[in-house]
Amino acid sequence: MKLTWLGHSCFAVESGGYRVVLDPYYVESYPPLHTSANEVLCSHHHRDHAFVEAVSLTPRKDSPFTVQTVETFHDDKGGTLRGTNTVHVLAAEGLRVVHLGDLGHELSGEQLAPLRGCDALLIPIGGFYTIDAETAKRVADAIAPRVVVPMHY
């Protein structure tokens, strides 16, 4: 499995010649994103996480990934300020990658269960519309991944 940071909260995850792009962005202060993928997954529908126009879709073939989702919120007020956020868990080659999107709160035990012990945790740390670094540390400690990759800072 290959994991590539493309900017902001956008990553490409590849396995067996199949490429998934997570949270493609349009942010005026960042270089434009131009990439290709077999599949695009978005945590929520704000253009800094769901600018699918930046991704050229290549013909789909059978995906080596299994994808699990965990519903969370984009804020710490049950989604009343910024709505929902979908966490994606991608598994292939015996590895699991968790992309937390624009997580805005600490996770419940039920939300943590499918994330615990993942191989790579992609976690927002910026504190602006997401959890901050201190909260991110608590979330990461609860998930206990092999590797933590900060994003959205």
Predicted regions and their residues:
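Core dinuclear metal-dependent hydrolase active-site scaffold
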Residues: 1-39, 46-50, 56-120, 128-134
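Proline-aspartate-enriched helix->loop->beta-strand connector
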Residues: 37, 120-123, 127, 136-153
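Conserved helicase ATPase motor motifs in RecA-like P-loop NTPase domains
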Residues: 43-45, 151
